[in-house]
């Protein structure tokens, strides 16, 4: 593998598709593997990455993603999920941030949360589509999931309007109400009506866990100071091979030349980890890919 391939790897390591001064959406945390696709290019999702309209996010097994929108709302994704940022725009209205967004969750579980401060200091107009169902959000906390046989939207707090294709919208204004839209072959099943019910606290706890980043899983966080050195080698080709494998599997690896010219080596790193414990947990997760146990560092 030639030097220009190492240069290309370094560009990917430091670049993030390009950045804007005030990101409308940013990756706060990611429990890899996860990817983002933009303009036909698919690459690993990294903590701190700024997102744009038309980006498509996907997660793998045992993966989680936490996004923060410009006005303070959070979007969480569970494992084996797919979400497109169909519309994403912001503007300042006096001292308030006004966010307009359309999110399309075509697979997996998600959660949308607006905290008290964000409600007071901003406004939002967000539509979330869950395959066959659209929920209109103005400031709330909800959980949803697109499964093979049904789409679910659960109101945790606030108020939302939920609508299945070509049907009248249904207003949910009671905490813990949820809406189920049966599907058949990935399409609305008109032979079965939508259902409304109230979720139990126990079930809600189970649902919420599907989108939460848990401690000890090796998740990266924006601003994390720790790193995992997943591999190190004096052989540039060997290091690049590990780098390529990690990125193909959805891990945001970077490659760095270290040492003097006489004793040059190449480290493959995954950064933005919040603690030594998370770096060590990630080392265990990626060992089957790298073939060796990495080491934590700062």
Show which residues each predicted segment covers.
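Short aromatic/hydrophobic contact patches that present stacked aromatics
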Residues: 66, 143, 227-229, 267-269
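Extracytoplasmic
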Residues: 223, 234-298
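Bacterial N-terminal signal peptides that target proteins for export
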Residues: 1-7
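Flexible, surface-exposed loop/linker segments and immediately adjacent secondary-structure boundaries
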Residues: 22-159, 163-177, 182-221
């Amino acid at each position: 593998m030639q030097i220009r391939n190492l240069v290309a790897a370094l560009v990917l390591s430091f670049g993030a598709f390009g950045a804007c001064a005030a990101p409308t959406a940013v990756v706060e945390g990611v429990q890899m593997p996860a990817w983002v696709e933009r303009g036909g290019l698919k690459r690993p999702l990294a903590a701190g990455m700024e997102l744009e309209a038309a980006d498509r996010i996907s997660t793998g097994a045992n993966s989680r993603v936490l996004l923060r929108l410009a006005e303070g709302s959070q979007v969480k994704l569970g494992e084996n999920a797919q979400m497109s940022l169909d519309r994403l725009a912001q503007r300042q209205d006096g001292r308030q941030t006004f966010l307009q967004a359309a999110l399309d969750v075509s697979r997996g579980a998600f959660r949308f949360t607006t905290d008290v401060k964000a409600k007071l200091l901003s406004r939002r107009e967000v539509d979330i589509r869950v395959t066959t169902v659209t929920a209109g959000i103005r400031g709330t906390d909800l959980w949803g999931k697109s499964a093979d046989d049904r789409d679910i939207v659960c109101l945790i707090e606030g108020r939302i309007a939920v609508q299945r294709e070509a049907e009248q919208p249904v207003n949910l204004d009671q905490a813990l109400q949820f809406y189920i839209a049966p599907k058949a072959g990935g399409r609305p099943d008109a032979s079965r009506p939508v259902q409304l019910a109230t979720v139990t606290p126990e079930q809600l706890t189970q649902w919420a866990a599907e989108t939460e980043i848990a401690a000890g899983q090796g998740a990266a966080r924006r601003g994390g100071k720790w790193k995992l050195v997943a591999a190190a080698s004096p052989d540039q080709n060997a290091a690049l091979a590990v780098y390529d494998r990690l990125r193909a599997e959805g891990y945001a690896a970077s490659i760095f030349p270290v040492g003097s010219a006489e004793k040059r080596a190449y480290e493959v790193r995954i950064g933005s980890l919040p603690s030594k414990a998370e770096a060590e947990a990630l080392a265990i997760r990626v060992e089957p890919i790298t073939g060796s146990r990495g080491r934590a560092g700062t």
